[in-house]
């Protein structure tokens, strides 16, 4: 491991430039027209606490190289965690053997790309004692557990990762990046007889241990406890078709899942998305502008470059209801005859990259949350969203409402639980009739064909004129 880093002109690199060049040329030896190396060296810590006791603490390191080759629209991918010269050349040649043809390149001149740094880090987690990390977890546990006697279980997780990457390709790109992320997870369980309800909060940022100077650990833990306790004492949500107000922050998970994946070139290029071929068409209410922006400083889903080495950027997906763009990676960009948008991501070197979201959100509108509620005769107010499922080809979704309330005559009447939102993403976009100005985001992990990656989801409070709500009670 000590030999991973090599001093090249301009500093230390994960691989020597001469080796990078030789591996790329080997990968192209059978007619490939593009080859890429992705190397990473990642360290991380994961600590789990249950009811104030540390159950597990793991620190580890993972490193390896992924080699990808294109020939037209074909793609071959291979990876290894043996980074010595002989093995890397062997893996490159084995991957190349899947293709046939004469070499198209015999020489590559690598040009170092200097990237803008959107995500400064002040306190590297590796330099912070484990006792300090556990101390943060204990504070969260005490705040949640002490909120009320109905809180019967509190689970806390702490996570930090420090990923170094090197990306080089046959177009001459050579770039390195470092991504440090820190996150706290709080899950509170409230009990009432045989009934149990849980609530989760998971603040995280693309930053170091200074995260805990930016968030109020105790207040977040208390909010999780409050939500769980409110829901265990709540009545069941009524079923039917009626307006739904979806609150800001993690409410954006519906757009992310039901619409965002359909705007990734992975599905668009195959015609497997309801948004395929609709650039320039109205796909949402004129109140809706939606963006994917990987450049927001220190946001959970931000990166200086994507996992193909393209600089991240602000991608406007929908503007005033009109479809303006997609999230595009290199391979699907070829298929669509469109340029990459800095949207290609992967969990690790073990995955070939593809188009994925970074920080995706519906932009702020002109109303206030209070105006939306006061102007609504009857609705379900979804304050926090839970898990769900989506068919990416159709945008059909099914999402649990983790914390809900009935709005009646312009006022929040009572809490309700067990509600489920059922619909089709593109139809819901058309039915958004009020958008507040209180844009906020929540953090999550998004799973897809290139693995699990950190993403921000966000929106202001919005009102949808009608959604099918699944519940245990008849309509009120």
Enumerate the language-model features and the residues they cover.
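N-terminal small-residue-enriched
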Residues: 1-476
